[in-house]
C-alpha cells in the first residue's frame, strides 16, 4: 500500500471529508497491468460513516430537486449511483457494458488504449426532459463518461450534472468533457 495525496478538492463536501476519502483510497501497484497504479475505492465503500458523508454531500451539492434519476456507470458507478438515488428519493438507471441489458438499448462506443468498448442504456430509460445526474467512481480519460453523457441525451434525458468521487487529473478527462461541469470530490 502506498500513500494517496490530495492535490485538489472540489465540491461542497469539504476538505475534512475529502481528506478522509483520500485516506480510504488505496494505491495498488501494477494492477490491472504492470506500470499502472490502480486507485482502489473499496475501502471507502466499506466505511459506512465516510460513505454516508460523501453521498449526503453530493446530494446537497446538487439539491434533491435538481434531478429526476441517477445514472450509474458499470460497475463501481452502480454503488455510488444507487446510494445517491436512495438518499434523494429518485430512481437509478444502469449504463452497462454491451450485451448486458435485456431490452432494446441505445449503444455508444469509445476508444480504449488498444481497441474499443461499448456501453448501453435502455431506450425507454427516461422520458423527454428527464433530468439525470450521471455518476461514476473515477474520471480518467473521459471516454466512458462522454459515451454515457451521449447515451443519456439519445435516450431523451437532460444531463443535470456529472459527478465522480475521484478524478485522475493528469489524464485529461475534465478537458475532454468541457464545457460540461465535472464535480469531483477529490482530484489527484
From Swiss-Prot:
Entry GO terms, CC: cytoplasm
Keyword flag Glycosyltransferase: yes
Catalytic activity: AMP + diphosphate = 5-phospho-alpha-D-ribose 1-diphosphate + adenine
EC number: 2.4.2.7
Keyword Transferase carried by entry: yes
Keywords: Cytoplasm, Glycosyltransferase, Purine salvage, Transferase
Pathway(s) of this molecule: Purine metabolism; AMP biosynthesis via salvage pathway; AMP from adenine: step 1/1
Annotated compartments: Cytoplasm
Disulfide bonds, paired cysteine numbers: none
GO aspect biological process, one term: purine ribonucleoside salvage
One Gene Ontology term of the molecular function aspect: AMP binding
Family listed: Belongs to the purine/pyrimidine phosphoribosyltransferase family.
HAMAP family in the record: Aden_phosphoribosyltr
General function of this protein: Catalyzes a salvage reaction resulting in the formation of AMP, that is energically less costly than de novo synthesis.
NCBIfam families: apt, PRK02304.1-3, PRK02304.1-5
Complexes and interactors: Homodimer.
Protein's name according to its UniProt entry: Adenine phosphoribosyltransferase
Source organism phylogeny: Bacteria, Bacillati, Actinomycetota, Actinomycetes, Micromonosporales
